[in-house]
Amino acid sequence: MTNIRKNHPLIKIMNSSFIDLPAPSNISSWWNFGSLLGACLALQIITGLFLAMHYTADTTTAFSSVTHICRDVNYGWVIRYLHANGASMFFLCLFIHVGRGLYYGSFVLSETWNIGIILLFTVMATAFMGYVLPWGQMSFWGATVITNLLSAIPYIGTNLVEWIWGGFSVDKATLTRFFAFHFILPFIITALVMVHLLFLHETGSNNPLGIPSNPDKIPFHPYYTIKDLLGLILLILPLMTLVFFSPDLLGDPDNYTPANPLSTPPHIKPEWYFLFAYAILRSIPNKLGGVLALIFSILILAIIPLLQTAKQQSMMFRPLSQCLFWILVADLFTLTWIGGQPVEHPFITIGQAASILYFSLILIAMPTVSLMENKMLKW
């Protein structure tokens, strides 16, 4: 068995990635989220495949086909709610995974980090297009509002929006192409994940201390396979609780009304995992400025390695930086809350303050505090 594992051309790749992989001996539970993201991706592809067997990408039948899945298909409601709530779990793991990278300085592994940012953008695009497919009120108006943002691009904006729509409004052509993209993107994500892992295994994993772990490595299996399995069980528990007890908790009631282009919902908002970016978009009165802030709110992650001024890679022994990190987390919670509120006083002001704080923390406060900590440690 060992000979096959180590000599077979295909199995030896698996062996060097998941069995005999040398891993740091001190990586904590925050490192579990990579494998949990892999599990979420597998769940989304499998449930999505079964949903695609029954779904019809047509404006007249899309809404009723989703109803048909929930009512007439064997365990269709379980598949549908696993897919919808699985997306929420996916993003929860994704945000924690990125947060861990920030906290422990994993962004110094620049290739892995940059592929991760591309993955984040791709997953967000996939989730947005998936939200349009049930063709409820929020699906239709969400698609209209978000795609319309591209019209802010000078000169080519309007033409670009109509090209994406496939007409002069969100209609059948838009739904069909969104379904096609929503189907293909998870496979592109899987390919990107492989590249992500390839670069990670080139350098080896980071660890909580942020120091080289070459002198102290342990095999990935059985130690971290068991640890990842425990993480998976702890992820399945809340997911199943959501699916079986409160499947619509994270959804919008407006999406149970079929799409009607003649009736605008009182408050258009995306799913919870986009609310922080949506709040940043809304906090700027100018359309182009809002779109740029929205894109930069994610793209800012790409310049974090350039803003690293600390002599220590990890924040583990940098209490001031830790304090700023948790202020950033609280700020993101505030932005998420604001994104779900109507555009009125005092929410507008809170949103603007939270948006300014978000960019100030990353661009100014964190690099400055890191320099202060270097001085305190006489480095």
From Swiss-Prot:
This is Cytochrome b. Heme 1 (or BL or b562) is low-potential and absorbs at about 562 nm, and heme 2 (or BH or b566) is high-potential and absorbs at about 566 nm. The keyword Mitochondrion applies. Heme b b566 binds at H97, H196. Binds 2 heme b groups non-covalently. GO terms for biological process: mitochondrial electron transport, ubiquinol to cytochrome c. One of its GO terms (molecular function) is metal ion binding. A ubiquinone binds at H201.
